[in-house]
Amino acid sequence: MSFESPPSITTSLHNTLLHISQNPYPYIPNPPNCPRRASVALVLRIRPSRNDLPPTAPQIFPYPEPPTDQRLANFFEQSWVKNGDPELLFIKRAAREGDRWTSHVALPGGKRDPGDASDKDVAVRETSEEIGLDLRGERCVYVGNLPERVVSTSWGSVPIMVLCPFLFIWICPAFPPLQLQPAEIASTHWVPLRVLLSPSVRTYEYVNVSDRFAKQGGVVVKTILKPIIGKMRFSAIRLRPSESLYCSSTKEYFSEESQPKKSIFERAYTWFKGGEKAQSDRPLLLWGLTLGMVADFLDQLPPHDSVELWEYPTFTSPDIRIIINLLTRNIKKRNTERLRGSAHDGTGNQTAMDGETTAVAMLESGGPLIGKNKTKEHAVGVMLEGYYDAMKKGVWIGAGIRLMSTLALILWLVRWYRLRSNRGR
């Protein structure tokens, strides 16, 4: 009996890119009263092995350029590519007050301007403006798109934009030096795909979401709920870059003398918590919207289980977590079965969520089928369908139980003190 060895990651990557290029995902129109669109670029490259260096002269394609499948075939047939290490480019956004995604690990990209001809042009323009990388020309191949997502806030109820991811691969051995935009980008990081696919780097991000409840009940409710519900826990990947570039003018890495000094009470509170890490000392965590889009891509690579990178968000307080699990048990079971049935039919990973927003991959209903990723089905939040309402209900039930328990304890202590005082007379 003979056993075939599994394909290398570069061979799997070639097959995946070929599939994506031949099976585009559909265009998603904006929901009513939601005119904004944004695009991001997933940029791949192959890092050569020390034992198989590329030729000094780059491969030049004749003009006009061959079709995408031929360009990919010519690129992946080279020895240094077969033995190389595929990597994906990430950015860390600069710290900006009032920015929903301040200091987040993300993909290069931004919102669409009136002068942009297409969503793809937005990704190309923003990548050039943010990190100085030109994705046009013979040194880079545009592969295709990934599922577009409707990004919503207020726990999935208010759409704010349509997010469009596009995939590119750099096919030249030499990579140009990046020029980071200090006002927007703190650093860039190349992370091997084998690291992103490894279970050992999976972790969690913890976010304070009491501000969400403040909108419903005011500052008093926020102050009461903050110690009661704890922090919200999200799935994450701890990035281990092979190469990083830092923008030396950003305040994440160099403190400013003009920053106001903390009061003695603030310093005492920081000391009580065990100190406060600088931005540069914090781990690079991939989570939220960016994790959802990256999981869409990684799930098409062996072992095709990157959707498991995502877990249902929950809270750190054990009792509230138990209540949420009880309320959402049947919902999660139902949605997981639906996702398994559509994981590779073009529906993709349906979930991406961070502390403030949710991104749901959507597909057009009806219309002609063009390739495998065109589907008749209108998929709207397979994994998160019904979960938000149950989770919010669980939070309020848990908070109510804690408050009633606290009041009961206070009443018991008062009664006990009065009885003890009466006995002493």
Locations of the language-model features?
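N-terminal leader/linker segments that precede catalytic domains of diphosphate-processing enzymes
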Residues: 1-125, 129, 133-163, 167-177, ...
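NUDIX/MutT-family hydrolases
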Residues: 180-208, 280
